[in-house]
Amino acid sequence: MALNIFQKQEVVEELAGVATKAHSLIVAEYAGITVSQMTAMRKQARESGVYLKVVKNKLAARALGDTEYAVIKEKLIGPLLYAFSLEDPGAAGRLIKEFSKKHDKLKSKTVSLGGVLYPAGHVDVLASLPTRLQALAMLARVLSEPVTLFARAIKAVADDKSETVAVSAPEASQA
């Protein structure tokens, strides 16, 4: 169904708004994906904080023109799917990577992160990025490690002193 000018403007505004909030963008070719497969992928996308949209490339180019994702304009050829990570940068990468394992028709075309254009192979790198909770857990572990090591060292010194006192006490009673 063809969109009228007002509907096209709404699509451009919506996509531009999402792009300004997004952490990363993956553009993928979806030709050959069935409607039920696409519906399943959209459901997974909603659950993982990924905005998934199929729009005409001219509208996408117009929407992304004033954002950090303007670098992908030259790659917008053919039927494409746009996956924006809204919560953490790796969410779209994990979604596309996981879904393309099951459905070989879905092929990532390009990745954009921080205004830099990367080839399709970087989807794996993006997918391996930790989630926000995982990153916070790693940070907490790194921050608590020196304190834990210090506490263990003090306990070891205290244990050595108590063993020394226990060993020297029987020697004193024999003398």
UniProtKB/Swiss-Prot annotation:
Residues forming coiled coils: none
InterPro entries: Ribosomal_uL10, Ribosomal_uL10-like_sf, Ribosomal_uL10_bac, Ribosomal_uL10_bac_type, Ribosomal_uL10_CS_bac
One GO term of the biological process aspect: translation
Short name of any one Pfam family annotated for the protein: Ribosomal_L10
Keywords (A to Z) from UniProt: Ribonucleoprotein, Ribosomal protein, RNA-binding, rRNA-binding
GO cellular component: large ribosomal subunit
Source species, domain of life: Bacteria
Gene Ontology molecular function terms on file: large ribosomal subunit rRNA binding; structural constituent of ribosome
CDD domains reported for this sequence: Ribosomal_L10
The protein's role, per its UniProt record: Forms part of the ribosomal stalk, playing a central role in the interaction of the ribosome with GTP-bound translation factors.
Family: Belongs to the universal ribosomal protein uL10 family.
Record note on quaternary structure: Part of the ribosomal stalk of the 50S ribosomal subunit. The N-terminus interacts with L11 and the large rRNA to form the base of the stalk. The C-terminus forms an elongated spine to which L12 dimers bind in a sequential fashion forming a multimeric L10(L12)X complex.
NCBIfam families hit by this protein: PRK00099.1-1 (NF000955)
Name the UniProt record assigns to this protein: Large ribosomal subunit protein uL10
Organism, as annotated: Xylella fastidiosa (strain 9a5c)
Gene this protein is translated from: rplJ
